[in-house]
Amino acid sequence: MTGPSAAGRAGTADNVVGVEVTIDGMLVIADRLHLVDFPVTLGIRPNIPQEDLRDIVWEQVQRDLTAQGVLDLHGEPQPTVAEMVETLGRPDRTLEGRWWRRDIGGVMVRFVVCRRGDRHVIAARDGDMLVLQLVAPQVGLAGMVTAVLGPAEPANVEPLTGVATELAECTTASQLTQYGIAPASARVYAEIVGNPTGWVEIVASQRHPGGTTTQTDAAAGVLDSKLGRLVSLPRRVGGDLYGSFLPGTQQNLERALDGLLELLPAGAWLDHTSDHAQASSRG
């Protein structure tokens, strides 16, 4: 994920605007915007219970953010920063990802893709730092997730589908061939599942009028290895949860995310009623 050149400094590049802040910095910005809730995955929550100590810390953080151009001289967030943080705090849809990076010692990177209206924001947390990017909608959901994960060669495998609980018990190539795939594909699947360099679980949520949310009870996935990338998508058929595994192309990642979003009440990333209204207003 491409970050700005300096921590806490807002920057622009083409159709992406980004800012990097500490958790304390995010809490100060959220306080200015009267926001208290953020996607759970990011773990943005008050971290200084003593009010007097918090005020001292926040005063210094505000000075730093002002010097870096994130806040103006009146202590208010720069407009684009405010838009990004409001999108995180009051999203219409959210993808929440947890990325376990076995290739760098088991570090977990937490990230989200949020939509509010037609505004899209990516946010990733690594330690106490948060990187936010405002992204053009035409980048697409797969492109936004790949902005965090980076590109990878798709694994050379056939599609594999089965009941999720049954597939979870398959650890050998011989078990996987029972699902009708060729032995060569089964061996690749077994190797990737047994020796991944990283894996990602992504869930989706929808915000309803009044502020309540619904989250999917299943996850889409990305699995990286030396043999390439796999993606998995959940589907419900007759009450059973099925999992489908596919080579990790951008098109298949988009399919996986679309399949995940179908589990939400709205069934999609966009609100079709608002899309229709916007189309009507454009004539």
UniProtKB/Swiss-Prot annotation:
InterPro entries: EspG (IPR025734)
Entry keywords, A to Z: Chaperone, Cytoplasm
Superkingdom field: Bacteria
Main location: cytoplasm
One GO CC annotation: plasma membrane
Family: Belongs to the EspG family.
Job description of the protein: Specific chaperone for cognate PE/PPE proteins. Plays an important role in preventing aggregation of PE/PPE dimers.
Quaternary assembly: Interacts specifically with ESX-1-dependent PE/PPE proteins. Interacts with PPE68.
Protein's name in the database: ESX-1 secretion-associated protein EspG1
Source species taxonomy: Bacteria, Bacillati, Actinomycetota, Actinomycetes, Mycobacteriales
Gene behind the chain: espG1
